Swiss-Prot record:
<keyword id="KW-0472">Membrane</keyword>
<dbReference type="Pfam" id="PF02117">
    <property type="entry name" value="7TM_GPCR_Sra"/>
</dbReference>
<feature type="transmembrane region" description="Helical">
    <location>
        <begin position="249"/>
        <end position="269"/>
    </location>
</feature>
<feature type="transmembrane region" description="Helical">
    <location>
        <begin position="198"/>
        <end position="218"/>
    </location>
</feature>
<dbReference type="GO" id="GO:0004930">
    <property type="term" value="F:G protein-coupled receptor activity"/>
</dbReference>
<comment type="similarity">
    <text>Belongs to the nematode receptor-like protein sra family.</text>
</comment>
<dbReference type="GO" id="GO:0007606">
    <property type="term" value="P:sensory perception of chemical stimulus"/>
</dbReference>
<protein>
    <recommendedName>
        <fullName>Serpentine receptor class alpha-18</fullName>
    </recommendedName>
</protein>
<keyword id="KW-0812">Transmembrane</keyword>
<keyword id="KW-1133">Transmembrane helix</keyword>
<feature type="transmembrane region" description="Helical">
    <location>
        <begin position="285"/>
        <end position="305"/>
    </location>
</feature>
<feature type="transmembrane region" description="Helical">
    <location>
        <begin position="149"/>
        <end position="169"/>
    </location>
</feature>
<dbReference type="GO" id="GO:0016020">
    <property type="term" value="C:membrane"/>
</dbReference>
<feature type="transmembrane region" description="Helical">
    <location>
        <begin position="109"/>
        <end position="129"/>
    </location>
</feature>
<dbReference type="InterPro" id="IPR000344">
    <property type="entry name" value="7TM_GPCR_serpentine_rcpt_Sra"/>
</dbReference>
<feature type="transmembrane region" description="Helical">
    <location>
        <begin position="29"/>
        <end position="49"/>
    </location>
</feature>
Amino acid sequence: MNKTAEELDSRNCASESLTNALISITMKFNFIFIITVVLISYCFTWLAIQALWKHNIFSNSTRLILIVCLLNSVVHQTTMLETRITQAYRSVVYDSEPCKLLFRSSDCVFELYLYYPTGYFSTYSVFSLTFDRLISHYKSRYYHMHQYFIATSLLVLQLLLTMFSFYIVFYGVSLAGYVPMCNFRPELTVYYGAINNVRTGVMVSCIIVTMFVYYVCVKSEKQIQKCSYSPGERYSAYENVTTSQSICISIVLQFSCIMISSFGSNLLIHITSKTTVSEEVFYAIVSFLPGVTYANLCLPLVIYFKTKLTTRNRKNRIAVMTSMYGDAGEHIDRLKRSWE
């Protein structure tokens, strides 16, 4: 163990400002707030998985990717739940003992090895979903013939990106020092910021690509609706638009959540370096910025409500088509006239 690690391990007592932050009313409110977010995410994750399983709004490839991402989010949210409960317990039991408030980083191995990989996996889900949309549009025939192979391949790549990021950040890093919560990274993780920048770049690139694919899908669907009488071709175009729109919304929301967390933390660090912001204020604000936790709530919300909306719209369209025109020939003639 080097000198820096030894120094960090010697600082086992929380400062007065940090102690005040950890036992404050604000932190207790934050505990209730984060627990509520996690519990709501559990409910909507279950509803979203049911929606994906029972309805064919999304393609089989997209559904498989989304289900795996939802299951991963459950693990991440559960890790967040456990770390907040243990922190709240210590803040109550050891509120007058600053030297027992903090967690030794080496005692948080279980949490670290779940929280960060699942967080990276959630972030890199945008990579899989974006390429899923690209392949579905530009290699449509191949995509529909090999959906499960494509989904599995993209998930493997997503996992490799996750493992690579985790390896860069944590490999060979001494888990020295003490942290306020077990999901806080050890101080000696020097590449943490660099990997965050890579994640941000990946998400921005995926947003741009997904928006482009959505735009192209909308144009393509309008053209097909005018020129094609094939129900299969028309439905495939409609499915591409619906799925691309949902994925685009999901990626933008996930990016927004993570950027609020990243930008907020960096801004606080910048302000702290320029002015005398106390640890109490710093940790009180940072505790409200777990971006991936919020992103893991947004994903099932988008899936569930988008599925309900699309199902309702589909039923309305079918009802209009079947109620207004009793004769199939008359309906086809009308479609021909409207497409001229």
